[in-house]
Amino acid sequence: MRAPDSEQLLIENLPDEPVGTALCTTRARGQLAGLIAARWPDSRVVCHTLDAYHAQETVAVQGSYGGRLETVCIPDFPLSPADSRNGESTGVVDSAGEGFDLAALPTTAGGESELTRELLREAHNRLRIGGRLLISVDNVSDSWTHDRMRELFPKVTVVTDENPTGGKPRGVVYGGTKDAPLRKQKEYDCEFAFRDRGTLLKAVSRPGVFSHRRIDPGGRSLIEAMAPADGDRVLDLGCGSGVVSLAAAARGEGITVHGVDSNPRAVECTLRGAALNDLSDRVTASLTADALPPAELRGTFDLAVGNPPYFSHQRIAGLFLAAADAALKPGGVVLMVTKQPSWFLESMGERFADVSSEEVRRYHVVRGRKR
C-alpha cells in the first residue's frame, strides 16, 4: 500500500546518513517507520499513533523488525525507545547523548492545528541536542507549518515537492536541528465546566480528543436523553473527554460507568475528569480498537450510549452497535445520537427490539432494547 502524500514525502526526503533512533507518526499503516527500520538495520524506531485501530494495522503490516520497530498507542511521545510505554507531555531531553536522532511527522492541511502545535513541541522535546525534526504537509502553498517550525528552530530548511511522476506537487517538507531545549513549554490541555440537571461538573480535554475544549452538541443531546437508574452499569462508547460518563455517574446512587475509546488521550481525559469530580470509584475507562469493553464486563451493562463520528461511512457506528449488543444484559437499552437517524433505525432493528427515535436539540437519539 502506498503511503499518503505527506508520509511519502518524508520517505523521499529522509537523511542520507544512518539514523540510530527515530520517532515518527503515521497517517496510514506505518510505512515511514517500516522503511526507516528496513533501510538502517542498526536503527531503533518508535511509531506513535493516537488511534488503537491504526496501531493494530501498523503492527500487522510492518511487524517489529526483530524488536527494532515498536508501534505505540499512548497519550504522548515516549522520551526514548527504551521508554516507549511511558510518554509524558512535558518530558524534555537536554543533552546530546539521550533522546531521538530523528523525529518525522507527516501532517495534513486539514488537520487539527492545536494538535500539530503540541506534537511539534513534544517532538522537539524528545530530540537529543543535534537531533533533526522533519515535518511534511500535503499543501504546496503552506505557510502555517513553516511559521510553527520557525518558532522552534533558528534555521528551517524547506523542500517543496517536485513530483517525480510529473503530477501535481504533493506538498512541502520542513526540517530543523535542535541546538537547545525550548525556553518555554506551552500546555495545550484544558479543563472546562458544564452542568447537568443542576450539577456542576468539570471535564478535561486535550488536542486530538473529540470536541476539544467544549461539550459537543450531540453529546449534550445524549446526556439529556439518557436516564440511568440508581445502581445501573453504563457503557460510554467513544467516551472522548468523558462528559457523558461523568454526567451518567453523577445522576444517581451507585451508578458506575465504563468508557471505551480508540484514542489513548480520550481514556486519559476521562480518568482525569473522574478524579476532578471525585468519581474515580465510579468511572473507569479502557483503550480499544473495536469499541468492546473488557471481556469480563461484557453482558453486564444496563445502558450503552454512543455518539459515533460521521467520517467513517458508518463503519465506527457499526462497531458501536456490535459492542453495545455484546455489552448489554438482556433488556438493556442502547442510545445512539445522530443527525441522520435512518441508517440507525434500520441497522438497530436487526439487533435490538423496540427501536425508536426522538428529537433532542436538533439531533435524533435512536433507542433500542436488547432482546
Where are these regions (language model features)?
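Class I S-adenosyl-L-methionine
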Residues: 152-196, 340-371
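A short glycine-rich, Lys/Arg-flanked "PGG" loop and its adjoining helix->strand segment in the class I
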Residues: 117-129, 320-330
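Conserved beta-strand signature within the Rossmann-like core of class I S-adenosyl-L-methionine
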Residues: 130-138, 331-338
